[in-house]
């Protein structure tokens, strides 16, 4: 400890290295505390349970654009039921959709898998007609909104696909798929669904 007698004058050049050393340690301590706090926040929210809100049975109102990226405005509306089941303690879930459309019944399935290394989800969709999983959209939730992207070929064109989950409450949520053929500058929605939880 630095101890100066009353009335004794301080020789600043003599004690300058001491003050510089104290200041340096203070800065390093504050920086390390900030990094540790950021790491703790990141570990606390790893995203594994981001889809827990959706577990259960939902009434689904679905709209599909019949001819995406063709300048069309012809939509078809469907009514159906969505069932979401938790798998692997929340690290995956299985979605089953059955909808009644003007042209007949539509059945879809989505397998969602959580990657603990990247802290991201992959959404893998299939319908009963194709019976194979499509290209997964990959992304994460931030501030209550999920955004997932992938690149695909549609009618011979390279496109970007965006799938958004928003307006999440305990009893409702909104889904929207959109395509872009200009590198993400503009997006055209082609699949919109609103889910309302069905009471037990």
What are these regions (language model features)?
Residues 34-200:
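Hydrophobic small-molecule pocket/channel-lining residues, especially in calycin-type beta-barrels
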Residues 13-17:
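N-terminal Sec-pathway targeting helices
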Residues 7, 32-35:
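Short stretches within intrinsically disordered, low-complexity N-terminal or propeptide regions
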Residues 18-30:
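Bacterial N-terminal signal peptides
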């Amino acid at each position: 400890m630095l101890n100066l007698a009353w009335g004794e004058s301080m020789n600043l050049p003599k004690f300058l290295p001491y003050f510089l050393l104290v200041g340096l340690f203070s800065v390093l301590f504050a920086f390390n505390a900030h990094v540790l706090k950021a790491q703790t926040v990141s570990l606390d929210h790893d995203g594994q349970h981001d889809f827990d809100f959706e577990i259960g049975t939902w009434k689904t109102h679905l709209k599909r654009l019949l001819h995406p990226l063709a300048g069309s405005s012809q939509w078809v509306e469907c009514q159906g039921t969505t069932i979401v089941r938790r798998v692997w303690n929340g690290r995956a879930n299985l979605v089953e959709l059955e909808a009644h459309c003007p042209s007949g019944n539509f059945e879809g399935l989505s397998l969602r898998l959580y990657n603990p290394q990247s802290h991201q989800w992959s959404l893998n969709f299939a319908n009963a007609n194709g019976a194979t999983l499509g290209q997964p959209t990959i992304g994460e939730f931030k501030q209550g909104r999920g955004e997932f992207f992938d690149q695909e070929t549609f009618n011979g064109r390279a496109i970007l696909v965006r799938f958004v989950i928003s307006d999440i409450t305990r009893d409702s949520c909104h889904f929207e798929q959109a395509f872009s053929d200009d590198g993400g500058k503009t997006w055209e929605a082609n699949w919109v669904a609103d889910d309302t939880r069905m009471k037990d």
